Amino acid sequence: MRRRMLLWLVIVVAVFGFEIQGSTQDIFVAKRALDFHHYLNRYAHLETSDYRMVIPAGTCSYASAGVSHWEDPTGTYNNALYTGEDDTVEWRVYVEEDGLYNIAVTYYPVPGRRSSIQREIYINGELPYEEAGFIEFHRVWGDGGLVQVDNQGNEIRPSQVEIPEWRTVLVADSMGTYSIPLSFYLKRGWNTIALVSRREPVVIGQLEILSLTEHPSYAEVEADYKALGFSPTSDILIKIQGEDAVRRSSPSLFPLNDRSDPLVEPYHHTLIRLNTIGGERWSRPGDWIEWEFEVPESGLYQIAIKAKQHVKRGSYSSRRLLIDGRVPFKEGEAVQFPYSSRYEMVLFGDEETGTPYLVYLEKGKHTLRLENVLGELAEIVRATQESLYELNTIYRRIVMITSANPDPMRDYRLEERIPGLISALERQSRIIGEIAEDLKAIIGESGAQVAVLEQLSRSLWLMADRPFTIPRRLAAFRDNAGALGTWILETREQPLQIDYIVIASPNVELPKTKPHVGQVMLHELRAFLSSFVYDYTLVGNVYSAEDFQVEPLRVWIGSGRDQAQILKLMIEDTFTPETGIPVNLELINIGILLPATLAGRGPDVALGVQDTQPMDFALRGAAVDLTQFPDFPEVAERFHPSALVPYSFGGSVYGLPETQTFSMLFYRKDILEELGLEVPQTWDDVIKIIPDLNKDHMDFGLPYSGIAQASSGAIGEGSATVSVLAHGGVSTFLTLLFQRGEDLYLGDGIATNLESEAAVQAFTQWTELYELYDLPLWYDAANRFRMGEMPILVQDFGFYNFLQVFAPELRGEWDFTLIPGTERDGIIDRSVPVSGPACMILSAARNKEHAWEFVKWWTSTETQVRFGQELESILGPAARYASANLEAVSQLPWTVEEYQLLEEQRSWAKGVPNVPGAYMVGRHLDNAFRRVIYYNEPARDTLLDYNRVINEEITVKREEFDLEVLAP
């Protein structure tokens, strides 16, 4: 008997070992799409020169149904084509020889959703490489008016408006990873070029097929100056203030206030002066700012820029310099601005000799543009990003055998079971070591940036040299790979803050930028004394009843100063001029709302309150019932019916939703394809794929945390909440309950519905997912998704924006879709609980009609769209605003496919009522879950026991507020 068991054991081990080894052949062969770097290497021998062909847009060979001819108001392109968000246009072109060609597109940005225009470029019916699927065309922005001054003496930045104009741009990588434009292989003879829409409409005027040549060096241009007899000018100095920029590629590049330096122009020690531009908002490669200036005479000028790059310690930021739309010579491709804690005058010239590069300017008006580029760091970033992708693959392959927490004393024979592992580790150690050396040569020092690379290189070398130590080094390997991802993000960022630009004759001494000791001391003293008298909670204009002959509304907002300033600007632009109602906006911690209200010092309107607060205040007579206003039904139609549920009780509504968030299913396309797995449609499908993931030591992610805890761009931060969704993984339980067609409460909340068979089944399924299928309770969703340990997970849809910004190396490798559902009567029910903050009117409001006008204005489509666009323009795509206004969502910068998915999931949304005693529901559902998971107690009995406690508390609270209670 023992011999038979031993024989079976040997067979099982042999088969298991064979399967592992057999499934890992050629595992480090790149599976992702071809990138431009490798594409360029493939066709580098086919470079062309001196070629240019213009293709009018109207000569296309194919156009989808939505494409139409466009009447050009400027009369420049009479054969232009309008293309919508889901259109395709294709042209046939003939070239005389095989080769690599650049493509320039002349386009006109028509009104859309204020985001950049995205297209894919197909050559002969195929996407040539990954970057061709993410081509961006910038809109052009400028100030919507002059700088205004509020009644406190602070300057108010003008809103950013689009400046539509014809632009011709070379097709380039949207992430700025390459220092050259993208090029495309065209075979001799006929070819097709297609533009496929991804986001935003645009008008196409023409395409150009051309071959670019390098810019001449300054030495060559200088020789041409001499040959043409150009001479330097004398005694001319022109200052261009940074804040006076006339055009920019992003609405986030607006004028800023900097009072850290007494020599900033203009300056005030306390009040806001818009005196600089750029800063950390100007970090994204590809973004540009343009100024106009005029010179009094023709001749040669020097250029200097008073700027501060105080973010990237031990490194520099780069800018491409363009005069009148052209780079004057090669040295202008990447002007470097080294790290400095204060403003420095950076001369455009030879760094070693201090000799300025002179630029010839004709008398009259000119433009100067600075474009954010990676410069010499471009190849460093590209190579590192490629290495990170392979390191993640290596880590994932190791984890498939060892798990994420291996036994450090066990020899897993990884070098045998993962063919190519050692050579891959050695290769990456060498590559990253070389990158570190290249970076050191570029920045001229061995600082923290280099140390990250050197540490990772050494770690990889040790793992390759001593494979038996890999299990105990695995956690460090994961951390180092995560640090490398952060390193890439930080290296890609190229911030720069500009005070002013100098155009001067070579004989003119440049202005001093360093304040003397007396100026610094006086500045610090004034700023310190002002802090005792200046009220920083008030935003913008502050009004009294005498100013408008009406009592101003007092509105509280509990968010960041950026959000408050956007809102105040919008109030001054539209609400007050249209209604005549003045508003004093105060930036406070919304957590003090309750004590302030009890003390009789609360606001008229509160923005960004947690979803439980309208009901908490209403039950105590402190919130206004909004249904009393005649036009409430019209206002309510702005939202999905589920959005009003948390603020409703007994036929009354005490708040309006600001944002609405819900879960989506995120997945790694590359990993699921590699494992041969389909995206699950139901929870039964999820249960089927969990073993397939587990056998490779991967997990399905189902968060043990509440939707209400995700930010998703909400305007308010709020205080601790007692929302049902704020406790543990209750959102998962509610998802399973709602998908069974049941509600959480009976009647108007007189008792819970947790005794129903559907609730017991949902609770049992919820606990079994963690108990039987061992789903992790706690995890870092972003890093585990990025590293591939958790290739499929449920997350708030705001996770999309996070991945777009913080995991650029995964571009094109992931997607999101509807959450898994429960099949009932042949239909997959994908119901999901939703949550979000609200705005409400306090009962103590002095003028409730005026407060209602403000709330209507705030939740209107126009206001929500503008606020969301302004917020994203300032804080970036990661701060995309999840407005609850349905029409506003349709105007935010999602692609057509993304928007359709979000709206389909929203159609399944169900709100969670906030009833008296509701705080006990989430708390005890979480307690019941823990009892089952940690103490192995039976699910049914545990749920029913806690349900009795919950209902007792609900009864107590309903009696307190004189409401009907459940009969004993």
Please identify what each model-predicted range represents.
Residues 22-24, 299, 383-385, 391-615, ...:
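Conserved N-terminal structural module of periplasmic/extracytoplasmic solute-binding proteins
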Residues 532, 536-549, 611-664, 685-689, ...:
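Hinge/lid segment of periplasmic solute-binding proteins
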Residues 97, 297, 764, 806-879, ...:
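Extracytoplasmic/periplasmic substrate-recognition and gating elements
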Residues 573-642, 646, 670-678, 789-792, ...:
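Extracytoplasmic "Venus flytrap"/periplasmic binding protein-like
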Residues 748-778:
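Glycine-centered hinge/linker elements that transmit conformational signals in sensory
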Residues 20-506, 834:
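Extracytoplasmic
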Residues 817-821, 869-931, 959-968:
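Long, aromatic- and glycine/proline-rich binding clefts that accommodate carbohydrate-like moieties
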Residues 649-658, 663, 685-752, 758-759, ...:
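Extracytoplasmic/periplasmic solute-binding protein
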